[in-house]
Amino acid sequence: MKQSRPLRENRKHGDLLFPVSAYETKMEEDFQMPLSYHWHPEIEIFFITSGKANFQVEAEQFVIEEGDVLLIKPNTLHGSHDCFGTKLEFRAVVFDFSVLSWMANVRIELKYLQPLLAQEQGRYILLREKNSIQKALFEMLNKTFFVFDEKEKGYELLVRAYLLQV
């Protein structure tokens, strides 16, 4: 994707040494704030903790709801305009691929990480199935969010470890 593509998000996610950010958004009932359509060069893991919303990734629209986990690949246009007038709470972790690949085993990067993010495999991954693996993934994302939010000494190591586990 070319850098000149419109709707690029201007927000900086993390910093040069640790390009990771975590966000939490809570919307009350009947509050229809759109999640502006945008793209960024980072990976985004978006997970719904309460409610549901119409979501769009590139030209594809679908409903995401409590418990769903959406991995949005780099340089992918995404956003929402309809939260059904219901309470909606979600968290997002946005990070550069280098957080996963830095000092990672080359075999792991080539065999698992690069194919996961390959655009020919689709622009996103949506996990809806409510089984034990998905539940553990959701818990791991919440741990990632809380560790990032607290920012205690060494938090970067835990955030990276949790993201690799996801």
Per-range role (PLM):
Residues 2-21, 77-145:
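A hydrophobic/aromatic-rich effector-binding and dimerization subdomain
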Residues 129-132, 148-165:
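All-alpha amphipathic helical-bundle segments outside canonical DNA-binding/catalytic cores
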Residues 50, 146-149:
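Residues at helix-coil transition
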Residues 1-69, 76, 110-111, 121-125:
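Generic protein-terminus/edge-of-domain signal
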Residues 74, 120, 148-152:
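A general structural signal marking secondary-structure boundaries and capping sites
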Residues 57, 100-103, 152-153:
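A generic structural signal for short coil/turn motifs at secondary-structure boundaries
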Residues 63, 69-73, 85-91:
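A short glycine/small-residue-enriched secondary-structure motif
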